Amino acid sequence: MKKSTVLFALVAAGMARSALAAEPTPFNVQQLVNLNKLHSAAVSNDGKSLVYGVKVVDDQGEASSDLYLLDLTNKNAQPKQITAAAGTEHDVSFSADNKSIYFLASRTGSSQLYQLALNGGEAMAVTDLPLDINGYKLSQDGKQVVMTMRVFPECKDLACSKDKFTAIDESKTSGREYKQLMVRHWDTWEDHARNHLFVAQLNGKKITEPTNVTANRDTETPPKPFSGMEEVTFTPDGKHVVYSAKAPSRDQAWTTNYDLWQVPVTGGETLNLTEANTAWDSQPTFSADGRYLAYLAMTKPGYEADRYRIMLRDNVTGQEKEVAPLWDRSPSSLTFSADGRTLYVTAQDLGQVSIFEVNTQFGDVRPIYNQGSNSLIAVTNNQLIFKKSSLVEPGDLFSVTSEGEQLTQLTDVNKDKLANIKFGEYEQFNFKGWNDETVHGYWIKPANYVEGKQYPIAYLVHGGPQGSFGNSFSGRWNAQLWAGAGYGVVMVDFHGSTGYGQAFTDSIGKDWGGKPLEDLKKGMASVTAQQPWLDANNACALGGSYGGYMMNWFQGNWNDGFQCLVNHAGLFDMRSMYYVTEELWFPEYEFGGTYDKNKELFEKFNPVNYVENWKTPMLVIHGEKDYRVPYGQGLAAYTYMQRNGIPSELLVFPDENHWILNQDNLQQWYKNVLGWMDRWTAK
């Protein structure tokens, strides 16, 4: 974002507050957790109406969530609240006739599907099922619904699964029994239940016995832990469901071979549509007329950060091709135009998440909108509706024409709260990193920046490692919170980061401690030379996951660069890490195989092998429910420092996983982190 654009946004926010309002204060964690959160947006099929959810947090920290309706045909329209029940309505969809909406809510103790007429009245339960519905999708004609519920594959009906869950809860024994991996995933021990798909007719009758179209298959769809209903769809004729899943096998922990499967809506034989590809296939998406199936496909088995290719299958001729094979970006979503000739996609791009138009016949790619981080909601009537956030915008809905013109803000869910918040000015920069290649990053000035002063640095290192600290607004690692606390913030997208071409992403493979370390050193030297208000001699570095690994790597390989370090969920010993993490495909690809077959590379970049160089004060943070990087990694680093007299503190959250999600815990996290940094930077 250009500097002038940022300043304009800040001025506009300031003008919005009333004359009696308090002066804006530097952003703090209390303000972060109290921001309203927009979610669950949907656009009607005729493009005239928008429904979205807003979670509102009051000054006492109490939260409520409701749905709002906005008339898109009237530029002066104000949103109308259409729900007021306790709890949260989410996963909104419009009916085929646009007269009602569907959503999920837990109004009777379990998550069920509801329908609400938009001309008034109360929401009516569409389902009465003994298990939670975790997601759903409507057929194109609106006459069917596919739902995902967690069941036991051997059970013939939902009551059987309900009884099994109850028996587990009431069992007097606590032992968990396993015969193959995975035994736990992300933050949950496996209980042998699976996400399955159920289809039912929407005919005005309450759904009580949907058809399990994935019956007897010991597989997960949508895949855990983060996939949703973007991995499931009806064929446009309503005769089949297509979904992404792994085949049942004993190699679940070390394969990324997700395929697209097609099954009749009545159940029966399942057809593997992508059997030839042994890498990841994802997000089946049909053109409205059913002729084309588009989906995303990787080509490298076992590599979760491979570039997603856009594949297009002609269901009439049976021919398939890659669309835009020379486009060096990895799409994260697919949406067909009404005529099926264009795909609208989002992809990380130079620190942004941008929206692109892709011609399906010729493969031409054209950027439509490339400021901030954007997720596409719908394409209708030559308008793209999307959610946008940035380093100074928590998230609202916008529209833009398919030509990328007439950007219009549709919601302003934090108008009053943002009027009282002062953000730091930010700018993207670049420098010559490893191999003299261009590397990008961001700096942010302290919110109360004064010309001529120098400020301590918060050097944020992202995780992944195939990830990015870009132009987005995070609910966890929010760079503006350090700016609000008086720090100059620096973030570098080192070699291995995403959004800069696949070769750049791939370059970190088998070189975890090499190119990234060189980039981070050169990035610090470059930005402090360019921006003299940054105090190069008074900096603390922070990182989570791979970023936490890098804090441990700094200790052994760059131990004179920082006054302090903060290591959140960082890897300490690559040998033990390999044997206790859950998704084995990740370390096996990153380090060229299993530990026993490739010890040399695992040990080359193993922080524990360099502990004799450790001396920088470090705060270690870990969640006990972190099964990606189990908490023993953090405990081991802390133990070494304590035993060897290195200033160190440990913060453990028994109820958190790899991320800090509880809002009270998040406030404790920031209190400890900023307190630790203030201590060592003498701020």
Listing of model-derived features with the role each one plays in the protein:
Residues N478, A483-G484, M491-K683:
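Active-site-proximal cap/loop segments of hydrolase catalytic domains
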Residues V54-D66, T83-H90, L104-Y114, E122, ...:
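A flexible loop/linker signature enriched in serine peptidases of the S9 family
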Residues G47-L50, N98-I101, V145, V241, ...:
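Hydrophobic beta-strand positions that form the internal "hydrophobic ladder"
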